[in-house]
From Swiss-Prot:
Entry keyword annotation includes Hydrolase: yes
Coiled coil: none
Catalytic activity: 5,10-methenyl-5,6,7,8-tetrahydromethanopterin + H2O = N(5)-formyl-5,6,7,8-tetrahydromethanopterin + H(+)
Name listed for the protein in its UniProt record: Methenyltetrahydromethanopterin cyclohydrolase
Top-level taxonomy: Bacteria, Pseudomonadati, Pseudomonadota, Gammaproteobacteria, Methylococcales
EC assignment: 3.5.4.27
Lineage top rank: taxon: Bacteria
GO MF term list: methenyltetrahydromethanopterin cyclohydrolase activity
């Protein structure tokens, strides 16, 4: 990718905003012994939809705009999150995608999370004497960021041990005092909001899995209904996934041939997956809660439009499913 826009430079002002206005956003700010800043967006405090919206923009490296509106697509669930970015590959895959596996300890006392956000673009490791990105994806993106501060988002319900934050800071070549960790439990308002704000990201991730040339994706928008939270983790996770699988809509603007765009449109919707047809919590239970047994092609929006800017043609595929969304969201 030739675009060297900095996901950390663009997201830091939003991080600072969360800290400055933590009171009105119902957040809690703490400092770990190593100096790392921790923003609790729903563990010991209520958090808020607005906090989730802003955290979603941080996840996108400050390169996306996320808004909340009401639409009439789903009569019972009018609250809708809208996402747009003019840098879809870097914003969604180079920052928002939760691709950094972080862990410490073992068993029920251990800590495990997938890191999302701009810190991913800075993180490196030494392999065979050479420095390389922590995630292989960045080699494909040909993207690496550098900045004086960074932030990472974790969808967890407990504070990570200081050892995990030390690891993140080391990988980013920063002192821990220049790292901010943002915590968004799945069952919280902010957590649900920032997950559904990934409606465009899941489309980019699936396009990558389908081997569509990422450099040909030049702009993108998406929207999905905001689900009601649920105190049970599995049900909360199910609802956030279903908001995208059954209610997500994405519009990609691409370069290249009409044939490639039409193929992408036809293969993108969640309905092409073998596991489509029931709420995600039910699918997950059938696989005995083994996430890796779920068909990876399921994680995608319900309906898509792919517009080829070279010809002006648009290709439509998939559709939203009100009945399945109702089964997932409840009364």
């Amino acid at each position: 990718m030739q675009n060297r826009v900095s996901v950390n430079a663009h997201s830091q002002p939003i991080v600072k905003y969360l800290i400055t206005y933590a009171d009105k956003l119902r957040l809690q700010i703490d400092r770990l012994p190593n100096g790392c800043t921790v923003i609790d967006a729903g563990i010991k405090v209520p958090g808020s939809l607005e906090a989730g919206r802003l955290i979603g923009e941080i996840c996108m490296g400050g390169l996306g705009r996320i808004t909340l509106t009401h639409t009439d697509t789903f009569t019972k669930w009018p609250l809708t999150v809208n996402v747009h970015t003019s840098n879809p590959v870097i914003a969604c895959l180079g920052s928002q995608y939760a691709g950094w596996s972080l862990s410490h300890g073992e068993g029920k006392d251990g800590f495990y999370a997938l890191g999302s956000g701009p810190a991913r673009a800075m993180a490196t490791k030494i392999k065979d004497g050479n420095e390389e990105p922590v995630e292989e994806l960045y080699k494909e993106l040909n993207y690496r960021d550098k900045h004086t501060e960074t932030a990472i988002v974790m969808e967890v319900d407990k504070v990570p041990p200081v050892e995990v934050t030390d690891k993140i800071a080391r990988a980013c070549k920063l002192d821990p005092s220049h790292l901010t960790v943002i915590l968004t439990p799945t069952s919280s308002l902010a957590g649900g909001m920032q997950v559904v704000a990934r409606v465009l990201e899941v489309a980019l991730h699936k396009a990558h899995a389908l081997h569509f040339p990422l450099e040909n994706i030049i702009d993108g928008t998406g929207c999905a209904p905001v689900p009601p939270p649920h105190p049970n983790f599995i049900k909360a996770m199910g609802r956030t996934n279903d908001a995208i699988l059954f209610g997500g809509r994405v519009h990609l603007f691409v370069k290249g041939s009409d044939e490639a765009a039409e193929t992408l449109a036809n293969e993108l919707p969640s309905s092409v997956s073998r596991d489509y047809g029931k709420p995600f919590a039910e699918v997950f239970k059938e696989y005995k809660y083994d996430f890796f047994k779920v068909d990876a092609m399921l994680f995608s929006p319900a309906s898509v439009i792919v517009t080829t800017v070279d010809s002006g043609r648009s290709f439509h595929a998939g559709e939203v499913d009100v009945e399945l969304l109702e089964r997932s969201f409840g009364g």
